[in-house]
Amino acid sequence: MHKLIIKYNKQLKMLNLRDGKTYTISEDERADITLKSLGEVIHLEQNNQGTWQANHTSINKVLVRKGDLDDITLQLYTEADYASFAYPSIQDTMTIGPNAYDDMVIQSLMNAIIIKDFQSIQESQYVRIVHDKNTDVYINYELQEQLTNKAYIGDHIYVEGIWLEVQADGLNVLSQNTVASSLIRLTQEMPHAQADDYNTYHRSPRIIHREPTDDIKIERPPQPIQKNNTVIWRSIIPPLVMIALTVVIFLVRPIGIYILMMIGMSTVTIVFGITTYFSEKKKYNKDVEKREKDYKAYLDNKSKEINKAIKAQRFSLNYHYPTVAEIKDIVETKAPRIYEKTSHHHDFLHYKLGIANVEKSFKLDYQEEEFNQRRDELFDDAKELYEFYTDVEQAPLINDLNHGPIAYIGARHLILEELEKMLIQLSTFHSYHDLEFLFVTREDEVETLKWARWLPHMTLRGQNIRGFVYNQRTRDQILTSIYSMIKERIQAVRERSRSNEQIIFTPQLVFVITDMSLIIDHVILEYVNQDLSEYGISLIFVEDVIESLPEHVDTIIDIKSRTEGELITKEKELVQLKFTPENIDNVDKEYIARRLANLIHVEHLKNAIPDSITFLEMYNVKEVDQLDVVNRWRQNETYKTMAVPLGVRGKDDILSLNLHEKAHGPHGLVAGTTGSGKSEIIQSYILSLAINFHPHEVAFLLIDYKGGGMANLFKDLVHLVGTITNLDGDEAMRALTSIKAELRKRQRLFGEHDVNHINQYHKLFKEGVATEPMPHLFIISDEFAELKSEQPDFMKELVSTARIGRSLGIHLILATQKPSGVVDDQIWSNSKFKLALKVQDRQDSNEILKTPDAADITLPGRAYLQVGNNEIYELFQSAWSGATYDIEGDKLEVEDKTIYMINDYGQLQAINKDLSGLEDEETKENQTELEAVIDHIESITTRLEIEEVKRPWLPPLPENVYQEDLVETDFRKLWSDDAKEVELTLGLKDVPEEQYQGPMVLQLKKAGHIALIGSPGYGRTTFLHNIIFDVARHHRPDQAHMYLFDFGTNGLMPVTDIPHVADYFTVDQEDKIAKAIRIFNDEIDRRKKILSQYRVTSISEYRKLTGETIPYVFILIDNFDAVKDSPFQEVFENMMIKMTREGLALDMQVTLTASRANAMKTPMYINMKTRIAMFLYDKSEVSNVVGQQKFAVKDVVGRALLSSDDNVSFHIGQPFKHDETKSYNDQINDEVSAMTEFYKGETPNDIPMMPDEIKYEDYRESLSLPDIVANGALPIGLDYEGVTLQKIKLTEPAMISSENPREIAHIAEIMMKEIDILNEKYAICIADSSGEFKAYRHQVANFAEEREDIKAIHQLMIEDLKQREMDGPFEKDSLYIINDFKTYIDCTYIPEDDVKKLITKGPELGLNILFVGIHKELIDAYDKQIDVARKMINQFSIGIRISDQQFFKFRFIQREPVIKENEAYMVANQAYQKIRWFK
């Protein structure tokens, strides 16, 4: 490793150089080293010899370059320049300079510097640097202006080319000049900050000093010695009495020798009695003394034994629970005791409260004498010994967090100090992998605990945040996640309780709550109020008084002062044990935390199996060209072996998977939870097969349920013959049908070549006997658990199909995240090999391997391969094909230059202004190895022109199908004079049974009428658009007429201008529809007459016979549902029944859409020969449309199912492709315009309809109204039926009635429009008693308004009639207009005979009469003259509804609309028609 120091214009920087990497130095902030005002860019790199160069100039120790403001000095240090020296052991000051008397002599220095106060560095953490004003001193690369400065441990000092690093025990030095010193040299190796094991820490074997537990028993003293209570005189008196009696007898009767014998014997008895007494007394005293001496010696030994046990206990406690000061030494020296405790140890989560008289770890057994009348001092001695050792004095008092919630009460600042001690103890001896802390505390107390943020245990790794909750934000951010974690752990315990297995949760969470107010309204409170020890969570509560504590607290600790505490209860038992807390005033807590923060705890030593290996590394190549794919394809033969590399067991130890039927295959299972590398191992296997075997020998069919990324990854791989995604209902059955079709195809080919196994066929293919390639087909499902859950029948059939197809070269590989409950007996028994990566739990591992091993896997890509019944069982690391492919070999040099700030929550917060990573001039996008290999295979395939294998699985129908992709759409090429039979191209059909997709074409003669049933919004209108344009493009407008009934949302309106369209109808155009119904009925009758006349059965035969053009009539109805409850429902349905029954032979065809089948009446529905179902919300409705179907209709716009023997699925075509530059309507308009311009022949007539307003002047010239008047008629308006001119013949009597005088006045205005012409032809006489004609009084021959004048007019009319009877018709006819006929009769008393004569003879003689009146008055009058006139007149205009008039008896009209202004009925010959008067 090299270090480079760069100095320029008072700026100093240091760079750790890594071999093979390049660096830049410039004034740009994005450079590796930024120097202000540098003025140039310096590139640092190594040449081929490994020498570092700056802009191609070698750096030999020192390189000086000219800069804009100052020289640029680059100073290069190597391992040889490094040294490390201890501080002097006696003095507190040392010098570094050029002089011989300096403690460290460096000749290159101009002036000396002084380093002092290093003897107290352990406490102060710094030394002082003193220098003169002529010496530039940099501390941490900042130039110091003061002459005396502090340098803390870890600080870097630079003085005149010398680099120093302050350490607690000495100085590290980098100098290119010799360093001479008498100081102790500490090490000769330069520290490598980037070494792989830098600051890594492995647990050492733990030394446990057990507390003595063997019982010590103090035996009771032996029974007291029994004292002889015989009194000496009892031995002396009897012989003395005998001597006395003997003397008395001798005195009475001297006997001689007998007396001597008796006296002698008595004397001897006396002597022996006395000696025996004193002898026994002496022996008793000795026995008593010995008993006492022996027992006291026994007690002394027991005392020593007890004392030894107590010392052993005290030592054990002091060893395992050292003081905080001792902990600091342990941490500082990186002692092996760090992180020594694990969750399996007996003292896990134990910590010291303080010093107290603690209970012995062993039992002292002594049985005190219950009762004795005599006091035995030895019993007192034994009791005294027993009572002396009741406790272990001044030993650590231990508490633990394993047995329920604990609580601290007392002053908060004292409790916080105790919690700090607990933090230090637990953090030092428990790894952050096993233990985490969460503090819920007041915001003002966070500063006190700020030092603890350095502890790795304070980071909640599951939430990636520090374990401090002190405000609303941190509460919501952390506690909600903790709540979920607790909930999951509780659920896990409940599930595991059924199997009686104990769960140890890691990490253990110590949940400290000093402020309950922060969680009082949070959902986590329900868990805080219970004991969570079982779930790996220890609760600690802090309150001022015991009354504030929750009821479930088991252990209570009262901190009374800094020197006194009391353990009140422990595990719910009252103990009241006082202790002395430890004083930690002189301990730097943050120093301990920082030292622990530097340690990276590695739990397990590295295995011989690599943690990861890339795909190309497994093949021991760097470039894809080196794979020699073509040669592998040429040499490898599947009928011999199918072994391909999958991973490594160790270095250079390749593990291969061979799915040859006689090896590991043909079928298998892959299991692995999320992030285990399950998909990657499948990808690597697919890639490995593709590299080793030709596309004609191996092919893949991927089942990617619900869609995913694997299908996209291999889309360009030639071996991929299909991907099955989104297997919903019918897609699952479609896939199964395709696979079964492939099996049938293979069986057919086997039969043709008289073989029964894929290997035999492959050999024939290699020999050229068989010509059609038939590769091994690998059906791979990346996630079959959900597929099996939602499509169980499909999975069952798939496994069964694979079992049948093993000899046909079918291989099934099923992968799942959670095999438990998914891998049934059928799947497991048919899967010869199993690949198990990391699974969620032991049950999953047992499910697939029948062992729990896979549950212990931690690395992604690590897997077990099991073949058969443990015939092969190996652990290996699978290859990773997603690695970056970089043939230049600099893929490891990509460096993230994002600068992060660690915020108050312990999270990384990017502070770069530009986070894009695109600051380089050129951004290089690297391929993955998988992409590179696929591209390489694709290029080989193209170069060798390899023929693609026929695909057994066609992709699902696209969601957009266009008519131009299915059939010719240029009408200019398609229109011809000869009428063609109609063929409708509906869309793209899918026939998986035949492995075919192509145009869905219907021959109209066979298809008949078409009914499409589908839910709204799924393409019903598009279906009609497609048919409209298909017909229009293939047939001229004179060959095909279309009537569009748009009962939906005006979807057919855009196509109304197509020249083939006769007319367009909406549901509210009742009159127009009624008129169309009559026209259709007339056309049916007309065409039937033609068939009858020419004795043919169809219009097609008529065309062939006569050569005449009778157009096809297409009736297209969108949303037939709207017919129901419409005013025209009955007549429309009756017409449609007739049309669907008779129209097909007449070349009149109906195509309709509806949302349900019962929208049509049964007779009509039966006549709809072709029924099509689109997606329907009511699934059962599909069966009503197409009958029993194999495939459901997908919930895709445009997808449909045709009723036929096989119920063909297809996707509706669209008449136009999507065009970014034009809207759909613009495309329609363009083609319509082109058709209109191209075609100059006849187009169909539309349905004539009454305009909203008809003005006399608008029609005067076009209809030649003056000529009509000149020919003896009054044009009055248009009829609604044919929109033809309606007129009143003046040569016949007529009667006009209306409801009100205003209408009469309007009628008068229209009648008199051509008054001049009338005057030329007629002598006009008007009898106008009501005044509606008075505007014309001066424009006519005679006008009568008053009663007498009316009589005169009447008399004139009678005389005129008589004169004409005598003389015959005059040169000029007369026209009499009688307005208000009722009043006229009242005035003139005209007889009935005169009325008859005027009506019958008048017109013959040129006397024309016109009656006008109010309808009600005419009806209510009882004048016979009116009745006579009504019966004899055959021209009527009635201005009220037919149902309301009483002139004639017509059938009642249901729901007849109200007569609008200017509307009337013309009645003639007992028939009526509705008209509208001119305006």
Swiss-Prot record:
Residues 253-256 are extracellular. GO terms for molecular function: ATP binding; DNA binding. The keyword Membrane applies. Keywords: ATP-binding, Cell membrane, Membrane, Nucleotide-binding, Repeat, Transmembrane, Transmembrane helix, Virulence. Residues 1-229, 280-1479 are cytoplasmic. It is a multi-pass membrane protein. The chain crosses the membrane at residues 230-252, 257-279. It is found in: Cell membrane. The keyword rRNA-binding does not apply. ATP binds at residues 672-679, 1014-1021. GO terms for cellular component: plasma membrane. Residues 652-846, 997-1183 form the FtsK domain. Gene3D superfamilies: 2.60.200.20, P-loop containing nucleotide triphosphate hydrolases. InterPro entries: Firmicutes_EssC_C, Firmicutes_EssC_N, FtsK/SpoIIIE/SftA, FtsK_dom, P-loop_NTPase, SMAD_FHA_dom_sf. It comes from the Bacteria. Belongs to the EssC family. Homooligomer. Interacts with EsaE. PANTHER family: DNA TRANSLOCASE FTSK, SPORULATION PROTEIN RELATED. The N-terminal region is composed of two iterations of forkhead-associated (FHA) domain-like structures, which could interact with other proteins in the Esx secretion system. Component of the type VII secretion system (Ess). Required for the secretion of substrates including EsxA and EsxB. However, unable to support secretion of the substrate protein EsxC. NCBIfam families: T7_EssCb_Firm. This is Type VII secretion system protein EssC. It comes from Staphylococcus aureus (strain Mu50 / ATCC 700699).
